[in-house]
């Protein structure tokens, strides 16, 4: 038997790196709403009283970048310098250029040629799914995200009025032979009003944030709760740390359970395969697991700039596949168009849907906009692979 602990973390929408991600994706959404074929690469830095946006944008859209950025910060809840940032008074600087013509010539195509649109860059991307949860996500990252969503909910609806936007979570799960057995440690660090005592804060976080989210059957008397372990977290947000787009790529994906190709998602239009191919990889892996072809599945794709078809495609089912991995590759090639334009069309990615992805994970969420979470190909894949419908359901997340 193999026994081990595995840990994943998440951060709140008010974490400075996530503030930057949300600003970048709010700019992307504002542009796509007017110009779906725009080319956008928006990078954001946020620090004390300052937002800086730069990158490459080629578009016919007319967007007030400063106003869009301020609105994103307002939605997060940074409305006073007392809590680390003020959307109304912060300075906002922009320095955008157009996309390089050397890149554009490999991506732009006529209407007749559009399905052969080349990848916007070289790179490797991974998709992953497993049957640990109904959402077919690894358990540690799934719960870490849900804890941060709960923190934001209680902050925004006023039930815990002393909460502030910046927060982090960490969940450690004990596994036996690859199956989650129990949650051993939960860490939450949350920014707070200076007048709340550590004792009151800890009790409220455990009772109001953690216990309503985590299933009772995964907790025990030995589960450790580490709440604000330093004892104080008043200075936070961009005042506490400089935030940058693309610095939370493991939080954004699978919490370290799966490989990562290194490319960030936020601020990039879907011609950038860092984003669109990672979404496609999740779509492929999730459908394979939903079909019962494997209980764990990781897909790797690689692209060359200006070339439409992936230069490589690899599947690893970690010994859980009902058919050989090389046959699964053939299934993928028959049922999924992994050219950039095929991905964009198949997943309907030219919509202004991206700000919502920029906090609480890009995967494993039941949001109608997240087309890559659909399992619409599972039945067909199952039939072609000759697999009987699964007799067991993934582990329940009901508390």
Swiss-Prot record:
The gene is metK. Its main location: cytoplasm. The lineage of its organism: Bacteria, Pseudomonadati, Pseudomonadota, Betaproteobacteria, Nitrosomonadales. This is S-adenosylmethionine synthase. Its cofactor is Mg(2+); K(+). Mg(2+) binds at residue 17. Pfam families: S-AdoMet_synt_C, S-AdoMet_synt_M, S-AdoMet_synt_N. Pathway: Amino-acid biosynthesis; S-adenosyl-L-methionine biosynthesis; S-adenosyl-L-methionine from L-methionine: step 1/1. Catalyzes the formation of S-adenosylmethionine (AdoMet) from methionine and ATP. The overall synthetic reaction is composed of two sequential steps, AdoMet formation and the subsequent tripolyphosphate hydrolysis which occurs prior to release of AdoMet from the enzyme. It comes from Nitrosospira multiformis (strain ATCC 25196 / NCIMB 11849 / C 71). Residues 99-109 are annotated as: Flexible loop. The keyword Metal-binding applies. CDD domains: S-AdoMet_synt. K(+) binds at residue 43.
